[in-house]
A protein has these predicted regions:
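ASCE RecA-like P-loop NTPase motor cores
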Residues: 1-239
Length: 239
């Protein structure tokens, strides 16, 4: 989880470690066969007024085809509440929303109900372990960059500038990479798990820094076709 782009340089820098032996151990999971990563084509523009509804319209058929069993991890409370409201108005699936009950109870209900959707934000991106058929689809609304006006980050950005560094590449990208890895990591928790991750952010494939994110994620099979996601989730062989 701590490596970014194949190295621990960011982690070592945060701890003030100048020299250290680095070793990355291979995962026991067979990601190419166990998981599919999709960055969909034709994503709604983030500056459109109807972005939330357009995103809901795009995602709901995939969620329903999978009969729930889905985490929707959001980067803002506004998106979290908006998507949950859209799903509740347009689907018969059980839609669970972070904040409506304690975290442990939410997870218990999600696992018990089987065909449910959990819409959540920050606290569910890490430290959550759902194994087996209860969870086979993780959707992430966009890359988890921390707002640059967040006080601690703002101070670190200023310190980086004073030292002649590049705050975006030295701080903001590595931290967003680590957070994204944590979110994606909710899916495959066991060697028998199988499922798909959908990341609704074209910057992964349209911006130069997207490669840093992709290189840091598990080596899942990749697609931009949401139909391929449905096929994969329904255990059909992909072309």
């Amino acid at each position: 989880t701590l490596e970014v782009g194949g190295t621990f340089n960011h982690f070592c820098q945060r701890l003030g470690i100048e020299q250290a032996e680095q070793k990355i151990l291979h995962s026991p999971f067979d990601y190419p066969n166990q998981s599919l990563l999709c960055v969909p084509r034709y994503l709604p523009a983030t500056n459109q007024n109807n972005t939330l509804q357009s995103l809901g319209e795009m995602l709901l058929p995939i969620i329903e085809a999978n009969k729930g069993r889905c985490f929707v991890l959001c980067t803002s409370y506004l998106m979290m509440r908006g998507l949950a409201e859209y799903f509740r108005e347009n689907s018969e699936l059980s839609i669970l929303l972070q904040g409506e009950m304690p975290k442990a109870k939410l997870l218990e209900q999600f696992i018990h109900e089987t065909h449910s959707v959990l819409v959540a934000t920050s606290s569910f991106w890490e430290g959550v372990d759902v194994r087996g058929d209860a969870l086979s689809l993780v959707i992430i609304d966009k890359l988890p960059f921390t707002a640059p006006d967040e006080p601690l980050l703002k101070a670190r950005i200023e310190d980086c500038r004073l030292q002649g560094g590049d705050p975006f590449n030295d701080i903001q990208i590595p931290e967003a990479v680590i957070t994204l890895k944590q979110g994606v990591g909710r899916l495959i928790r066991d060697v028998t798990d199988r499922g798909a991750v959908i990341i609704c952010d074209n910057r992964l494939v349209m911006r130069n820094y997207g490669e840093t994110f992709l290189k840091s994620l598990p080596n899942s099979t990749r697609t931009r076709d949401l139909n391929k996601v449905v096929q994969f989730l329904q255990n059909e062989k992909m072309d």
